């Protein structure tokens, strides 16, 4: 806004391209950031969209002080055009939201996220940066490598016709899980496929997302047609 006023006063004819609403705030020890259009705004505008959510670390896990973050992006389910992104975390949130904002500003897609080049060293990032991973997950959704289910859909399902498969370890399962879930650890899944119903929709899940996705792929490759992750 200030730049537009300055240019007008000076007589410069520089077109204003508009803003995409990028913001960031410190909330106690956490950082919250947003850019572009979130799902709520897209639904209000009746724009068809899909979303992907990941929970990576701020940098390589083997390097000390890696902190968790959650990244959600919204995108067009056909073209992959990137609509928006939100991030909640502790460290590295600012640079990730800036990367997503830059792609949106240039009318980019989730495929551009996959190709963004970042500086890498273990104290600062991972070999596959979280922004790129968000793009990979979105690409998996668009190409049908995985069919996601969102919490809004899952909260209303009837257990009689559905099967919740928790693929975490028994120790993780003992701490907490979803009501009615059955625990088959990912490492045991291939040997215990006969315990799963083929006449029910199976929802795979884990703590973060990777193991749930791998379980989904295992089931699909073994002939299970009713699977969501």
Regions found by a protein language model. Name each.
Residues 79, 169, 188:
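Short, glycine/acidic-enriched loop or turn micro-motifs at the edges of active sites
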Residues 6-13, 104, 142:
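Short, hydrophobic alpha-helical segments
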Residues 145-158:
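A short, well-structured juxtamembrane/interface segment
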Residues 163-168, 184:
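Short hydrophobic beta-strand that contains or immediately precedes a catalytic carboxylate
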Residues 190-229:
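Catalytic cysteine-centered active loop of the rhodanese-like fold, especially the PTP/DSP P-loop
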Residues 1-5:
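Short, small-residue-biased leader/transition segments that mark boundaries at the very start
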Residues 28-35, 43-145:
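Flexible, glycine-rich terminal cap/loop adjacent to redox cofactors
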Residues 13-41:
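Rossmann-like dinucleotide-binding cores of NAD(P)H-dependent redox enzymes
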